[in-house]
Regions:
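Alpha-helix boundary/N-cap detector
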Residues: 46-53, 141-145, 190
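Short, structured coil/loop segments at alpha-helix boundaries
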Residues: 8, 52, 90, 139-140, ...
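Extended interaction regions within the primary functional domain
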Residues: 7-8, 57-65, 111-114, 124, ...
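Residues that form generic nucleotide/phosphate-binding pockets
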Residues: 3-6, 61, 99, 153, ...
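C-terminal extensions of enzymes
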Residues: 1-63, 69, 73-74
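Glycine/proline-rich loop-helix segments at beta-alpha junctions forming the active-site rim
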Residues: 143-232
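Conserved mixed alpha/beta catalytic, RNA-binding, or beta-rich assembly cores of soluble enzyme
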Residues: 55-58, 67-148, 220, 231-232
């Protein structure tokens, strides 16, 4: 539909109206797609993809309702996305996680068109299934969406500090933020060293919790996101 719509302004108008009506109906009836066949892709190859109902609902849920684990609400680590999904299977994220080395941080990926993807939700639809051309550049609309979502998330959760390894300027005020990129690539030796140091310094006066199961907290987070509760 997106491919055909670009043939005329009227077609684009119809598609946008369709997406808006579908969004309103989905929110009213609670009809959202939560599971898809393995290998299904959500192709986001045009500007109009940003208005897709699935994408808009994700952005709204993350910004306004999503709640991370109580164990990881202190330090927020912002990371770039990767072409490979889920992100943790990529070589770049393997290096990021090795440098971070602390399970109490809250890892959130910055991406388009979803805006933000918390690490514990990277396996679910649509985070694990979207496909978008990667250029490394952000347009004003993408940055606006990301910053608005991030502002709401930080405000609601109440992180004490942010370790920013994403390369995106957050524009946030009133919170301690450490830029670990300094204009370098996310995977450079110096950037990774700064990432490791920033995380370590954030917890230098605290001891590691021993009764913390990341897997259990991940499942609880997915349950809260999908079902509104983690009380099993």
């Amino acid at each position: 539909a997106e491919l055909q719509s670009k043939s005329s302004p009227r077609s684009v108008e119809h598609l946008r109206r369709h997406d808006q009506l579908t969004l309103e109906k989905s929110e009213k009836l609670g009809m959202t797609q939560s599971s898809v066949q393995f290998g299904t892709q959500l192709r986001c190859h045009s500007f109009e993809s940003r208005n897709d109902v699935t994408i808009r609902l994700w952005r709204e849920e993350i910004a306004e309702k999503y709640e991370p684990s109580m164990r990881t609400r202190d330090v927020l680590v912002l990371l770039p996305c990767s072409a490979k999904k889920p992100y943790r299977l990529s070589k770049s994220h393997s290096r990021f996680r090795k440098s971070i080395g602390n399970r109490r941080v809250h890892e959130v990926m910055i991406t388009s068109p979803l805006g933000l993807v918390p690490r514990e939700l990277e396996d679910i639809w649509p985070a694990a299934h979207y496909d978008i051309p990667v250029t490394g550049d952000w347009d004003k609309d993408e940055l606006s969406i990301i910053r608005q979502m991030l502002s709401r998330l930080v405000e609601r959760v109440g992180y004490s500090s942010i370790v920013n390894h994403s390369g995106v300027e957050t524009g946030l005020d009133g919170i301690n933020e450490i830029d670990t990129r300094k204009g370098e690539s996310a995977g450079s030796k110096d950037s990774l060293a700064r990432l490791k140091d920033a995380v370590s310094s954030s917890f230098e006066n605290e001891s590691e919790e021993l009764d913390f199961s990341p897997r259990e907290e991940k499942l609880k987070s997915i349950s809260r996101f999908k079902l509104g509760s983690d009380k099993w």
